[in-house]
Each structure stands twice: as structure tokens, then as C-alpha cells.
Amino acid sequence: EPFQASQLDQMIQQDDSIYRVFDPQEGLNGARTSYFHKSVGGYHAAKPRALQNLFEYHLYQNNLQVMNMLNVKYVIQQDDEGNSYPAVNPDANGNAWFVDQLVPVSSANEEILKLKDFNSKTQAVVNTKEYPELTKLRYSVDSVASIDLVDYRPDYLKYSSNNSNDGFAVFSEMHYPSGWNAFIDGKPQDHYKVDYALRGMKVPAGQHEIEFKFEPEVVETGSQITLAANILLGLIIVGGLGFTLFRGKKEES
């Protein structure tokens, strides 16, 4: 193994909920943290530009609201003797939540700057120039409204939601429109980039099942090409066998 689990890693791993870990000493490209935990930077060396900007403008500046919206539950700190320990962030937003206000901006620059002075638990910043259909800016969130992550896989996420009113939910996952499709109760649903990098979605009142599926077009196209090639190959084989049998019978006669 490239790394050995420390006592600190073992302490964090005792928490079996879904959260993220941030080690300021490692920063965006911390391989060790990603090896043992779900780190903010992820395990892949190539990082989305939006995530890089969040680190540069907010995480490195200790913006707690951004840490909360990224569901950072543990921050690796050092004590006076230089020993690392996991500091618990009790205010992490969790995997998804309902907000009662959309804060409109008109550019990506305004969007990332607005994260300096917003409340990530009750507000979501949206670029209304990019999404002019988001005209409703106020939502009612009752005290029992909930949205829970019930299935978590690299290419599939499922949530269970319950809200007395039509709502707007924010999901602590990077917005990546090229492949991720959203569904509510099995029906396709639009989702939006909010808070500069996350996913947002309008959710109707009541109890619902929300799914995100990674279905990139390149994979679908490749699968279709593979299927067509296999069918063509099968036809060639069948045709070849038919021709061989026909020629054999002709020679016998």
C-alpha cells in the first residue's frame, strides 16, 4: 500500500456517514487524504476549474460557509506539538438541503464573489443570466422538510425528499452537466449550477425519490457503435456460414 493508516485516519473512519475531509496542509491535490477518505479535492489529479477556484478564493481563506456547503465534516489540524488531529465541523450542511432563497447574480465572477457573504444553509447563489427560467427566488421550508442521501455510488446517487411545499434543493456534489442526468420519481428533471459549483434542483411538494445518473453521451455512442459492430459481425459470420453450406451442397449435386 502507498500509505499506512494513522490513528487519525482510523478515528475518522469510525464515522460511517458520508462526508468530506479537508487537510489544509495537503491542499487541493492531497493524495494521502484521498486514499483513506472522501477528500474535498477528490482522488483524480485533474480537477474541475470551478473546484480549483473554490480552493483559491475560499477554502484557503477559511471560508466556513463554503466548507459547510462542500460537506466538510473533518478538518485536519495540528496541535502545539505538531501532531495532527481531526477537528470536527459541526456545521457541515450534509449531502443535500432545502434553501428558502435564491440569490441572483449575472456572471460567474459575481457568483464566486457572492460566496464570501451568503448563508449556505438558507441561500443558493444562481446566475440568472445563465438560467433565466429561475424566476422564483423565495421558497417556504418547514421545520420537518428533509432530503436524505440513501444510495451513493461513483455513477449513481439517490435521495429521498419530503417537503410540505414546493422547494429548491442544493446537493453537495460538483455540477457536471456533461453526463449527469437528474430524475424525480423516474422522470427527467432539469438541474442547475448553484453556489458556483454545486447542483440545485426544483423539487415539488410531497415525498419523492431523486436520482442522479452518470450517463455520458460518449459512452452511449460507444455502446451503440459496439452493438452495431457486433450485429454486423454476426451477420457476416452467419452469411459466411450460409455461403459455405450453399457451396458445399452445390458441389455435392
Predicted regions and their residues:
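Active-site-proximal, structured, solvent-exposed surfaces of multi-pass membrane proteins
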Residues: 122, 126-253
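Conserved luminal/periplasmic juxtamembrane motif of membrane-embedded glycan-processing enzymes
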Residues: 1-173, 180, 252
